[in-house]
Amino acid sequence: MKVRLVPLYFAEANDRERQEFADQMVRLKEFYGDVAEFLPEVCVGDPIPEADAILFPQLIFAAFRHNDELTGYKLPMVVLTSRFGTVEMWDWEIVTYLRDLGCTVFSPYNIDMAKVILRAIAIKRTLKG
């Protein structure tokens, strides 16, 4: 069973950031395709399809401007922003901010940890029935 991830992006992203987002999605599909199903990308604030978790392949400053939208999703969030398929070290500030808002945020620092987290989120769906 694969975890269903819905990647979120920010409308405020510039052209360079949009390309980096697309490049990161390619990498993440390579790293995690064996444990994750990647749903279509959704802009922060828009409705999301049925999913197990939210994926942030990129975090930008705009995250600080979307409190209501982000807290409204009620799904765990996984931050995989580095080119190595883990969390970028400077994203800790946004991760901490999201946690302070009450979001459940996972920011794995290696691929093995990320896969354990993703598998656990997928299993949760099975256990709920």
Model-derived regions, located:
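An N-terminal assembly and electron-transfer interface module characteristic of large anaerobic redox
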Residues: M1-G129
